Regions:
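An alpha-helical support segment within catalytic cores of ATP-dependent transferases
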Residues: 1-2, 125-128, 144-185, 388-390
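A glycine-centered beta->alpha junction motif in the catalytic cores
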Residues: 88-102, 142-151, 266-284
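Active-site activation/catalytic loop segments of kinase-like enzymes and analogous catalytic loops
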Residues: 214-247, 263-279
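ATP/Mg2+ or Mg2+-diphosphate-binding catalytic cores
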Residues: 267-360
Length: 392
């Protein structure tokens, strides 16, 4: 019993959707609605959970207009051509552009950070059993991707492997220290609506799960940072603003980069699996290019440097309890490591990296000693940190 179904002056069009059929209804009055016909595999319990979640978020006055209004009193069912029961829901339509299609500015990014933080805050007071479930797209649970590493070759394989290794260290081993709550689960650039440089809508709660709170920020960043020229500026806008409204803990910051890269790993593994299944689908290759570009950039960033940068953006000291540790070091009297003062001797950097001219012809140990001796003369040699060395 909806008035627009009785009207002859409505326009009907189909919206893009991965799992469901979403129909846009336009009334002559300019009002717009969405009729969501769910995949028959979707459980009624899960759909009712999504409705409850949206209603809870709309209780917050600052967020009320960001989420669609649920118009149905109860979920009804439609029988498709294959005699399958499909749930039908009706919501208001949030009219704007997708974040992915928008020319985003500092103001847009700051708006995103603010609303993600307000959403994180509002979700603290919501919990349902339906949120506690396993989910492939969860960046805090990517161990399953290990068995697909061989879908990649060369440097791409190394990047995927390195990202999974970082997940183990910075996310998996830290997971118990991260605050958990119900999350949106998929604030990607096609689930965020923009108008006039402001975020005006979050949509699609089908991936909502109980997970680390920081997941939503990490997932959003894994899309919002794609294609940006200045990663630091975008991080400053989004993370800096998020932190003003929802304080990130030391542990959140410690795991953030690992979570961003984990979401990118999932994206790339899913794309590789699909490409194997549909080798002639050119769209699959195009759609993952931005993910590769971003993960390659992030792979060049030392995780601890990233942590220090995010701490600085959040107006925190470079490391946890920095002042206390610095004071402790200053209060100690340390002995000399050498019988000379490194500050007062002539010294040179000795490069033993695999690209070093000293190792060009794969020389013997004796020859290396002679080459180094000629290079240093009477100077003290200092090796570089984190070199990929052929010799020690």
């Amino acid at each position: 019993n909806y008035s627009f179904f009785k009207s002859k002056d409505i326009k009907l069009s189909r919206l893009n959707s991965e799992r469901d059929i979403n129909l846009l209804i336009k009334e002559k009055t300019a009002k717009k609605y969405v009729v969501k016909i769910s995949n028959p595999k979707e459980s009624l319990v899960q759909l009712e959970y999504q409705d409850l979640l949206i209603k809870h978020l709309r209780l917050n006055r600052q967020l009320k207009q960001i989420y669609p209004k649920i118009l149905h009193n109860k979920i009804l069912f439609y029988q498709d051509s294959k005699q399958r029961r499909c749930a039908v829901r009706i919501l208001t339509y949030i009219d704007g552009d997708m974040y992915a299609k928008s020319k985003n500015t500092d103001h847009t990014e700051q708006s995103l950070g603010r609303l993600l933080a307000l959403q994180s805050t509002q979700l603290q007071s919501f919990i349902k059993n339906q949120a506690i479930r396993k989910f492939e797209w969860n960046p805090s649970d990517i161990r399953w991707t290990k068995k697909f590493i061989n879908l990649f070759i060369g440097n791409n394989k190394n990047i995927i492997k390195n990202s999974i290794d970082e997940y183990e260290k910075f996310v998996f081993k830290n997971i118990k220290n991260l605050k958990h709550a119900v999350t949106h689960g998929d604030p990607n650039d096609y689930n965020i609506v923009v108008k006039k440089e402001k975020i005006i809508g979050f949509i699609d709660f089908g991936d909502s799960i109980y997970a680390p709170v920081v997941n939503d920020l990490a997932i959003s960043l894994s899309y919002a940072l794609m294609g940006v020229k200045n990663l630091y500026k975008s991080l400053q806008n989004i993370v800096g603003t998020y932190n003003k409204f929802y304080k990130l803990s030391d542990q959140d910051i410690y795991s953030l980069l690992g979570l961003i890269k984990s979401r990118l790993v999932i994206t790339l593994v899913m794309a590789a699996k699909q490409r194997k299944k549909y080798p002639n689908n050119k769209y699959l290759s195009i759609s993952e290019n931005n993910a590769w570009d971003l993960i390659r950039k992030l792979n060049k960033v030392d995780p601890y440097f990233f942590i220090a940068v995010i701490r600085d953006i959040c107006n925190l000291e470079p490391i946890s309890e920095f002042s206390k540790k610095l004071q402790l070091l200053k209060s100690q009297q340390f002995g000399n490591l050498f019988d000379f003062d490194l500050n007062n001797v002539n010294k040179k950097i000795v490069n033993f990296d695999k690209s070093s001219f000293l190792l060009k012809s794969n020389p013997s140990n004796k020859k290396i000693d002679n080459l180094v001796g000629k290079f240093l003369k009477k100077d003290i040699g200092i090796g570089l940190y984190k070199e990929t060395r052929k010799v020690y």
